Amino acid sequence: MRTQKATSVFVACTAAFLAACSPVQGGEEPSFSALSYKNLIPNESYSPATAPLAPGTALDLSGDEPQPGAYFNYQSCTAAWSFTLADARTIAVTASHCGKPGDKVWAGTADGDFSYPAEPIGEVIYSDFYAEDSHDLDVAFIEITGSADYYVPGAVDNSVATSLAHLPLHVCKLGRVTDETCGTLIHGAAMAQLNSGGLQRDSIAARARVCSTNGDSGGPVYGEVEGKQTIVGVVSGTTQRLEEGHTCETTQTDMELSFTLATDIQVLAKEVLGPMA
């Protein structure tokens, strides 16, 4: 079997396509807009009692079935966090542009190559960009039905924001390719346009000056909230692509990262999946 990664694993969001993607001008303070659902004031978070996948787990997603001797196209992405529903289903969170409902999900590897033969560990059951009533959020939910040896590039506390007075001014992200990278917040939630291959969608996202690349999509974005490391978002896209052969450590860039807010995702999860355990 020959494998081929999709060429648009990680979405690029450029200032040419959307004014909201433009960085804050010199001398301006980051502006914290109200969250897309409601203005949430207290800082609150929760830690799922049962989490099948650790934040930062590598995932491979595809609508195709791998066959010996045939090309296999798949999306290389990362999980942000996971949780259990009241009906005992276990769910992982990633980016919507990583997969459509019905796509199968496999455990990813450290080198990014698809491990064959392998059994799927789950299936995408909701992807907001493909929903009839989209909420303009780059988020997908995966029902986990199997297990495997998972690759996780680092450790992040599985504490997820449910409400925030404002986002942390300094955030980090964990992705399967570039591991942990950190930087300063540029602005809070605003409408942006995501472009990935033939997919163009409006999306509500915050922005930070953080380096990332293909395969990191869907990973956790986190920062310190009241002295505690807390996941505040999910990696969505960047203003620039990391050139082949370059790394975040060796490349000086003005790259900016867009991320979907965890608070919005929590509201959406309850709406489309039901109550959590």
Residue ranges and their predicted role:
Residues 32-84:
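N-terminal activation segment of mature serine protease catalytic domains
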Residues 12-19, 81, 136-141, 237:
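Hydrophobic alpha-helical membrane segments, chiefly transmembrane helices and signal peptide h-regions
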Residues 36-48, 163-164, 186-200:
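Penicillin-recognizing serine hydrolase domain
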Residues 28-48, 52, 107-110, 114-120, ...:
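Polar/charged, compositionally biased leader and regulatory segments
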Residues 1-28:
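Secretory targeting and sorting signals
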Residues 67-77, 149-155, 180-277:
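Active-site region of chymotrypsin-like
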Residues 73-193, 223:
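Serine endopeptidase catalytic core focused on the charge-relay Asp
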